[in-house]
Amino acid sequence: MINIKTLLVATILLFSYQFLNLQATEENIKDGKYNVEVFKTPSCGCCYGYVLFLEEEKFKVKQTDMRSLHSIKQKYNIPVEMQSCHTTIMGKYFIEGHVPFEAVDKLLKEQPDIDGIALPGMPIGTPGMPGDKDE
């Protein structure tokens, strides 16, 4: 039986590899239609880095600092094994962790019938995290 972690990771990989075959244009994603909210703890520098990354991609970002993100993770039914240091809400989707733009872009263009996507942990070289992906 496939567990939810495997399913979500497979979904992220699928998004990353097939984003060139999408119908919506990049301008539709970046024209300000997507207001996003990032829930994070006040002291997390990498979370702030992800906010800056989203703003560079022309998203309108609202930051909500919280001492504990447990209630947000619970509200959006994010499995414990898929949780990361911050949760972003984009329309009807959650984006958990340092998910690359290609995956976010594909999610918003295709609008699949899922709750969200996740990249658990804090992988080196992902948006908001220092280092190169090759490390």
Predicted regions and their residues:
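N-terminal, post-signal-peptide region of Sec/Tat-exported proteins
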Residues: 47-91
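Loop/turn elements at helix/coil->beta-strand transitions in domains of secreted/extracellular proteins
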Residues: 35, 59, 113-115
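Bacterial N-terminal signal peptides
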Residues: 8-18
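Boundary at the C-terminal end of the N-terminal hydrophobic targeting segment
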Residues: 22-26
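Bacterial N-terminal signal peptides that target proteins for export
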Residues: 1-8
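Thiol/selenol-based redox catalytic cores and closely related redox-interacting motifs
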Residues: 75, 81-135
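Active-site-proximal beta-strand/loop segments in catalytic clefts of secreted hydrolases
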Residues: 39-41, 64-66, 98, 120-122
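Local sequence-structure signature of Cys/Sec-based thiol-disulfide redox active-site neighborhoods
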Residues: 29-57
